[in-house]
Amino acid sequence: MARKKVDMSEAYDYLREKTGSYVLCFDVQNLTAFNNISRKAGDLAILEEALRIDKAATDDMMVMRIGGDEFALISGLYDLDTVKVLAEKVLSKNGRTIMFEGRELPLSLYYGMIKIPESLRYSEFFTDMHRTITNSKK
């Protein structure tokens, strides 16, 4: 997977341009089970999560890793129904397995959504994205 260097001020400007649009937040369900097998299995689960999100995203969307196994997809979309279709593209793969050392391991993701606020303060929004993920687990 290619890495792209991003200046955080550029990311902040991108977020400000997308004010009011939806952000989809994702997290691996039960990453601990993968890590209990091995850290490599956990890393593979995170990589697969990123690939699933990236495949659903269009070129004008931004995917950000916001934590160990937590990602945000900045959709730039304002229509809730369109956002739900996008989320379903990612979630439709829940339960599909990944292969690790000859073992099939089912991978599923949690997800929540949040809008980019009018008065964007990155630190607060970052906290809100994490809260969105936490709430999706309930």
Identify the function of each model-found stretch.
Residues 64-66, 94-110:
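Catalytic core regions of nucleotide second-messenger enzymes
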Residues 13, 84-91, 101, 108, ...:
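Catalytic-core segments of nucleotide cyclases and related cyclic-nucleotide turnover enzymes
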Residues 2-22, 29-54, 64-68, 80-84, ...:
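Conserved long alpha-helical elements within nucleotide-processing catalytic cores of c-di-GMP signaling
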Residues 25-27, 113:
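Short hydrophobic alpha-helical segments used for membrane anchoring or interfacial signaling
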Residues 74-78, 95, 116-117:
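Residue-level recognition of strand-loop junctions within catalytic nucleotide-signaling folds
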